[in-house]
Amino acid sequence: MIEEQKPNNSTETAISPMQCYVQPFFRLLHKDCFLAIREIESNSIDLIVTDPPYGINLSKGYKSGSEELVKGDDGFTIMVFVDELMQEFSRILKLNSAIYVFTRFDVYPYWWLKMKNYFETKNQIIWSKGGGGVGDLQGNYIHNYESIIYATNGKHKLRNKREGSVWQIPKCKLEFHETEKPVELIEKIIVKSSDEGMVVFDPFMGGGTTGIACKNLNRSFVGIEMIETNFITAKSRIENHCPQIRVFP
């Protein structure tokens, strides 16, 4: 079941991710994250996986307030609301559950410190994605990894076998979003920190990859996306995706 909620819906009700644990549900909201997240019931989310926007100038390889940024990726706006965002995350996340936030080397320390005020920050996971990069090709080393902050709300138990914090997963072709992540990477996070039927939340849904991973793994999904083109893409992908059975050690 996929439920869509648009910005000017006069019949809005509180989001209740406790609806069904046998057959997963999918609720997609085309709204501003900071407005939509307030509708989510407290202690109703089992896992948060998200890649918040941050500013980057692709032509020069550094942040700039005057240059054109990646569409929908205004890091200077998002930083103002990090405290508010973390406060809401801590409200909706169940006790003994986990949160994973993608970030980058230059904004990682800021996010880590902010998250530490609300969660128990556990690890910096390094996603080694391989390949080349963009920006200053002569003056910079190739940027071939991303940081993921893993934190918990209480004593969270990881599933399956214990493993290291460097994950070597090839990056995917950018078909649906400017900062698209491989489905395999999101699936790995979901399998390590949730069980079938649990509710996964992504407030910056982008092209819908987290929803695709949830569909493959029999998890319920609540996703928010403000940019209309991204929302349409994500909704279409999730609706038309045929789940693929995955086996994880």
Write out the residue ranges for each language-model feature.
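Short, conserved SAM-binding/catalytic segment
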Residues: A14-Q23, K235-P249
